[in-house]
Amino acid sequence: MTAQTQQSIMAKLALYAQLSRIDRPIGTLLLLWPCLMALLFAAKGMPDIKVLLIFILGVVIMRACGCIINDYADRNLDAHVERTKQRPLASGAISSKEALSLFALLGLLAFALVLLLNPLVVKLSVVGIVLTIMYPFMKRVTNMPQMFLGIVWSWSIPMAYAAQLGEVPVEAWWLFAANWCWTVAYDTMYAMIDRDDDLKVGIKSSAILFGRFDRQWIAVFQLMAFGCFLMAGLSAEREFIYALGLLGFIAFSVYQQRLIFSRERPACFKAFLNNNWVGMLLFLTLAADYLLY
């Protein structure tokens, strides 16, 4: 293999990594924290190691799948949006056929992991992949694609309960609802960054729908998320340390509200990124609560 061929292969792999957002782990982390919390709740603090590893790998792979299919759906629009015009598909660096092939390969890999678990998880995973494919196209038909994303982003929660328990108990849906509300809140912050560009190209979003009341609606969803996280903890009979995590959730929410007050793009992006620390805090306090109580 010549040096030129090696360079060409490495350049192509770098483009695939960019398409899959491997270079931007924030989305993977936001997807991972509630999934890990679900495993802790379902297993009362001691999840099966095999299940844990499968879900961590599955989250990484499925987040990549979601990014690929999203960029494929938006390939003709991203070129007109400042933040996305340099993405591999939008710029033409990667073909649609290459993107779909990578999506199929990663999807099959994720499904192979799921086959190591029980039949209920397999069934739920099929729904999950359908939801993942549907999401990018919801931005064309609904003013609230963030609500649909909340379902997609929370689907690992019933899957985690099913993997650990063989069923999805009622209390699992408190965590599902909490993560759904939280996702709508932070993805609306993200949508505020692109609002002007989205209006130009006809993309719908909650930031556009809420208009000048965007901050207030984000606060509503943050409060609903807090209430549902609280109910999830009460259902699992959690103690003081988890409660500290919930207080931290409120503190972070207030901080994010201050950041987005100006509606400036850098501040909204900073508020969005801050949610990684929210997820980490909730997971760590839940883990510590199970460890000590």
Swiss-Prot record:
InterPro entries on file: HB_polyprenyltransferase-like (IPR006370), Prenyltransferase (IPR039653), UbiA_prenyltransferase (IPR000537), UbiA_prenylTrfase_CS (IPR030470), UbiA_sf (IPR044878)
Keyword hit for Mitochondrion: no
Catalytic activity, EC: 2.5.1.39
GO terms of molecular function: 4-hydroxybenzoate polyprenyltransferase activity
Keywords for the protein's UniProt record, in alphabetical order: Cell inner membrane, Cell membrane, Magnesium, Membrane, Transferase, Transmembrane, Transmembrane helix, Ubiquinone biosynthesis
Reactions catalysed according to its record: all-trans-octaprenyl diphosphate + 4-hydroxybenzoate = 4-hydroxy-3-(all-trans-octaprenyl)benzoate + diphosphate
The protein's required cofactors: Mg(2+)
PROSITE patterns given in the database record: UBIA
Gene Ontology biological process terms, A to Z: ubiquinone biosynthetic process
Membrane topology classification: Multi-pass membrane protein
Functional pathway: Cofactor biosynthesis; ubiquinone biosynthesis
A Gene Ontology term for the protein's cellular component: plasma membrane
Protein localization: Cell inner membrane
Annotated TM spans: 26-46, 49-69, 102-122, 148-168, 173-193, 217-237, 240-260, 272-292
Family of the protein in this entry: Belongs to the UbiA prenyltransferase family.
Functional summary from the UniProt entry: Catalyzes the prenylation of para-hydroxybenzoate (PHB) with an all-trans polyprenyl group. Mediates the second step in the final reaction sequence of ubiquinone-8 (UQ-8) biosynthesis, which is the condensation of the polyisoprenoid side chain with PHB, generating the first membrane-bound Q intermediate 3-octaprenyl-4-hydroxybenzoate.
The protein, known as: 4-hydroxybenzoate octaprenyltransferase
Organism: Shewanella denitrificans (strain OS217 / ATCC BAA-1090 / DSM 15013)
